[in-house]
Amino acid sequence: MKTADSSLLADIREVNLSYLLLAQRMLRDDYAASMFRLGFSNEVADILMRLSPAQLVKLANSSSLLCRFRFDDYSLLSALTQDVLGGALQQAHATILLARQPVEELA
């Protein structure tokens, strides 16, 4: 395996672990708000909350990113990047657009 590939895999694993740890911490602090912010269903949130540190590390060692870029629609991405509506109104618009997205389900 090339050094660049090894470095990329290490970076992916680091991002995965950081994401899983952050998600667990968010869910412990405010379960309902975190489910909304993360786009998780109850089932996904419950499973993530029950994972031990060893299970988190094992899951993080995937060669694929575990987090998903949720801004896959132009109106949402532009609402977050263009200062057309101004501060609070722009943030509210982005929140409404995010709320319309379905939560992730276990397939």
Swiss-Prot record:
Subcellular location: Cytoplasm
InterPro entries named among the record's database cross-references: Flagellar_FlhD, FlhD_sf
GO terms assigned for molecular function: DNA binding
Coiled coil: none
Entries under Pfam families matching the protein: FlhD
SUPFAM superfamilies: Flagellar transcriptional activator FlhD (SSF63592)
UniProt keyword annotations, A-Z: Activator, Bacterial flagellum biogenesis, Cytoplasm, Disulfide bond, DNA-binding, Transcription, Transcription regulation
GO terms of biological process kind: bacterial-type flagellum assembly; positive regulation of DNA-templated transcription; regulation of bacterial-type flagellum assembly
Cellular component aspect of the GO annotation: cytoplasm
Subunit structure: Homodimer; disulfide-linked. Forms a heterohexamer composed of two FlhC and four FlhD subunits. Each FlhC binds a FlhD dimer, forming a heterotrimer, and a hexamer assembles by dimerization of two heterotrimers.
Domain characteristics, as noted in the entry: The C-terminal region contains a putative helix-turn-helix (HTH) motif, suggesting that this region may bind DNA.
Family of the protein in this entry: Belongs to the FlhD family.
Function in brief: Functions in complex with FlhC as a master transcriptional regulator that regulates transcription of several flagellar and non-flagellar operons by binding to their promoter region. Activates expression of class 2 flagellar genes, including fliA, which is a flagellum-specific sigma factor that turns on the class 3 genes. Also regulates genes whose products function in a variety of physiological pathways.
Name recorded for this polypeptide: Flagellar transcriptional regulator FlhD
Organism: Bordetella pertussis (strain Tohama I / ATCC BAA-589 / NCTC 13251)
Gene that this sequence comes from: flhD
